[in-house]
Amino acid sequence: MKILILCTGNSCRSQMAQGFLQSFDRRLDVYSAGTEPATKINQMAVEVMKKAGVDISHNKPKNADQYLNEEWDYVITVCDHANEVCPVFPGKVRNRLHMGFEDPSEAKGNYTEIINEFYRIRNDIRDEFYSLYESEIKKKIY
């Protein structure tokens, strides 16, 4: 099963979602990309994912355009901006979903307050994607 997860920068939310989905089931072929990719992955995202036992430290932000002509079982946007500007995929997309999450990189405050926001969003992403995996994706794996 081939899944593409999109956000704006592909530096945080979509990377976390990709990491979690792959950790749920290694049979899944999961990619992530951004509509306006950042230059590097957010290090706080790497840190909170490592605490969850998922290593995303070697991931790099990618542009959604490189995936436009491919076929996908799922294309999932994880931020409102990506949902609004999500490109039309000329390739076949069987299921298009939007699962909006706040951007933890916009958190304000001291280090503890900011990292706690990253943990909160990480947990939301984990829980929502696990629910999607259990209720829908797992049943369709071929």
Which residue stretches match the model-derived regions?
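Residue-level detector of flexible, active-site-proximal loop/helix-junction positions
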Residues: P37, A82, D103-S105
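Short glycine-/acidic-enriched loop or helix-start segments at secondary-structure transitions
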Residues: Q15-A17, N42, V85-V88, K108
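Phosphate-binding/catalytic loops
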Residues: C86-Y142
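Mid-chain, well-packed structural core segment of small domains
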Residues: E70-G91, H98
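Residues at the C-termini of beta-strands that transition into short coil/loop
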Residues: G34, C79, G100-E102
